[in-house]
Design a protein with these regions (language model features):
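Membrane-interfacial loop-to-helix junctions in multi-pass transporters
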Residues: 40-42, 71-84, 113-123, 203-207, ...
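Short helix-coil transition sites and intra-membrane helix breaks within transmembrane domains
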Residues: 54-60, 90-102, 134-142, 289-305, ...
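Long, contiguous bundles of hydrophobic transmembrane helices that form the permeation core
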Residues: 2, 172-233
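C-terminal transmembrane helix pair
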Residues: 160-171, 286-375
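Cytoplasmic-side transmembrane-helix entry/capping segments in multi-pass membrane proteins
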Residues: 11-15, 40-41, 67-81, 120-129, ...
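Interfacial loop-to-helix junctions that mark the boundaries of transmembrane helices
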Residues: 4-10, 32-42, 154-166, 197-202, ...
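Transmembrane helical segments that form the transport core of multi-pass membrane transport proteins
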Residues: 37, 59, 63-66, 211-313
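Hydrophobic transmembrane alpha-helices that form the pore/transport pathway of multi-pass ion
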Residues: 83, 89-136, 147, 302-316, ...
Length: 375
């Protein structure tokens, strides 16, 4: 019983999605139509992107980038600006959760080395906000964007109009908040040596993963079919580093699969489907933001997409909905867990700062959404 409780605490969204899927199977008995429920293209892309990013991470690409930028910093303010900007822009390509897994521990290490740990709470919170909001700017920045873009056939122009204005506002807000903090010089710190030699050795090793990332992007833009790219990625990883298969978040894939099963069954129950359509249609902005606060933005995107008429507004909503509560974005939970592991005595301080700053950004960006969408 204890192991079940521990597993639920570790994978709450998967457990909830599994229970919903199983419950829906009691209402719609399993048949061959179940095979048509999943969006196999989205699942294949998620798998490919996770394994490609794991390849970059295993080669130390992101840590090397962080150290390179660190050497350019001369003050706490400048260092903080660089780290927040790094999280914002990296999340567009390597996703928000991988960005935080990579750079939050690096940030904590650096601020301990310069003897400024008291600055960490606000900076890690702002890095989390930056990763969540930066990831909204591209179709591959987070799972909800990937799903909504691949399953709906929305054009890149529509997608850009749905996210780029808010990403721009968010970047200005983030940099302003960091800039107004008290500044001070930081001492010279030697983090690691031999980076120039590492860069020379890194290039040939990283090229195959760059090529695989390019293939994934061509699938996102519907230039290539997903199945040949999936097989190509799997073959290259088998040849280069089979251990990367262990880096894939299979519970995220299973969570998507469970939600596809749940939603496929719900659509076959006219009474429930009609009610959800009436609740969501025309209210995509608030439905997406509010649902994200309770079930997090990835499940909210999968659930609401089936009943929404205005998909661009829903894309805006579930991305802004990643702000707010700690569970609104699963990437935020990653930051909290990483911080709490090193500073367990400051968990309450972190949660207070996290909630405060997230509400500020959510209110400002929601107001911008009301103005820009004319709601």
């Amino acid at each position: 019983m204890l192991s079940v409780k521990v597993f639920f605490q570790k994978e709450p969204v998967f457990c909830i999605s599994l229970l919903l899927a199983l419950a829906s199977c009691l209402l719609v008995h399993p048949d061959w139509d179940y095979l048509a429920y999943p969006d196999y293209r989205t699942l294949a892309l998620l798998f490919c992107l996770m394994i490609v990013v794991a390849g970059f991470q295993s080669l130390g690409v992101f840590a090397l980038l962080g150290r390179t930028l660190l050497r350019m910093a001369r003050s706490v303010r400048r260092l903080s600006l660089m780290m927040v900007a790094l999280c914002f822009f990296c999340s567009m390509v390597i996703t928000n959760d991988v960005t935080l897994i990579t750079f939050v521990p690096f940030t904590m290490l650096v601020f301990r080395m310069i003897d400024r740990p008291e600055r960490l709470v606000r900076l890690v919170v702002l890095e989390t906000v930056a990763a969540n909001l930066g990831s909204m700017a591209t179709p591959i920045g987070n799972p909800q964007n990937l799903y909504l873009c691949t399953s709906s056939g929305i054009s890149m122009g529509q997608f850009a109009r749905a996210v780029l204005p808010y990403a721009g506002i968010a970047l200005v807000l983030l940099l302003t908040v960091v800039w107004i903090q008290r500044d001070e010089l930081i001492p010279d710190v030697t983090l690691y040596g031999g980076d120039e030699d590492k860069k020379r050795k890194l290039l040939p090793a990283v090229l195959p993963f760059v090529a695989l990332l390019a293939l994934c992007l061509l699938v996102v833009f519907r230039v290539l079919p997903y199945l040949p790219v999936l097989l190509c990625v799997a073959a290259v990883v088998v040849a280069l580093d089979r251990s990367l298969f262990r880096s894939v978040d299979y519970f995220l894939l299973l969570t998507f699969l469970c939600f596809f099963l749940f939603l496929g069954n719900i659509k076959r129950i006219p009474e429930i489907s009609n009610v959800l359509t009436q609740l969501v249609s025309g209210r995509e902005l608030w439905a997406g933001i509010l649902a994200s606060q309770v079930i997090s933005n990835v499940p909210a995107a999968i659930l609401l997409a089936e009943f929404a008429q205005d998909l661009p507004t829903l894309i805006t909503a579930v991305n802004l909905g990643g702000l707010g509560t700690l569970i609104a974005s699963l990437a935020s939970l990653i930051s909290f867990q990483l911080f709490a592991r090193d500073y367990p005595e400051k968990k309450g301080v972190f949660l207070k700062a996290f909630t405060g700053w997230n509400l500020v950004f959510l209110l400002v960006l929601s107001a911008a959404a009301v103005v820009l969408t004319g709601l």
